[in-house]
A protein has these predicted regions:
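Hydrophobic HxD+1 residue recognition
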Residues: 131
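Protein kinase catalytic-loop region centered on the HRD/HxD motif
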Residues: 115-127
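Short beta-strand micro-motifs within the conserved protein kinase catalytic domain, predominantly
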Residues: 69-80
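C-lobe/activation-segment region of protein kinase-like
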Residues: 126-128, 138-207
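Flexible N-lobe loop architecture of eukaryotic-like protein kinase catalytic domains
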Residues: 62-67, 88
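Activation segment of protein kinase catalytic domains, centered on the conserved DFG
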Residues: 96-112
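Structural motif in protein kinase domains
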Residues: 87-97
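ATP-binding glycine-rich loop module of kinase domains
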Residues: 2-64
Length: 208
């Protein structure tokens, strides 16, 4: 199936999923004219009420230019389409299950997650989505990219900084579960405790 809008054409390769609400279908796709540029996640939004809300966070004029993962958005055939860059590779969840990363590598992954979210400067709702361990892709050099699957679309409009901090807290406890359980690193213990107690008001406070 080909989706066309103006001079853009996207070929839908396979279906990723339908969201729990049933209002959004997600597909893996490629640009028909520029297949070498990689893959995309195409979100097909059938519910126009959701589409109207998404317009505020998925159009180029409403988001930061640095949010490069957002490729395009448009109306076509009575539906609203949002196109994101698709990150291929092993998820953080899979990497943690493998248990192959040493402490230094896991610290670097956490640092790269922070660096990437600040670099992209994405809307809070997508940051909340990106900070899920199954949406974080880790490459062989420990670089980090994100996927966007609208997992909790109904909650997007309620996301505040405290929800983002909770997501980061969860990642820290998973990435460094061994060290926290054994109490083998005082710095990590103090950092995790500060997160638990809500000592950081903003994500930037954790990074600096």
């Amino acid at each position: 199936m080909i989706i066309k809008f103006q001079d853009m054409q996207y070929e839908l390769i396979s279906k990723i999923k339908t969201t729990v609400s049933g209002n959004i279908d997600l597909y893996l796709a490629c640009d028909v004219k520029r297949r070498e540029e990689g893959l995309y996640t195409v979100a097909c939004v059938r519910d126009m009420e959701i589409a109207r809300k998404l317009i505020m966070v998925t159009t180029k004029q409403n988001v930061s230019l640095s949010f490069r993962d957002l490729h395009a958005s448009f109306n076509a055939d009575g539906k609203y389409y949002v196109i994101f860059n698709y990150a291929q590779g092993r998820t953080l969840q899979q990497a943690l299950e493998d248990g192959k990363f040493n402490l230094r590598e896991r610290l670097q992954i956490m640092k790269n997650i922070f660096a990437q979210i600040f670099l992209l400067n994405m809307p809070e709702c997508f940051l909340y989505e990106a900070l899920r361990k199954e949406n974080i892709i880790v490459d062989d050099s420990l670089g980090v990219r994100f996927n966007y699957f609208f997992t909790e679309i109904d909650y997007y409009w309620q996301v505040q900084e405290k929800e983002l901090m909770n997501r980061v807290n969860g990642l820290v406890h998973e990435l460094f579960a061994r060290e926290l359980e054994k109490k083998s690193s005082r710095e990590l213990m103090e950092f995790a405790l500060d997160l638990d107690e809500g000592c950081y008001g903003y994500l930037w406070d954790c990074y600096v």
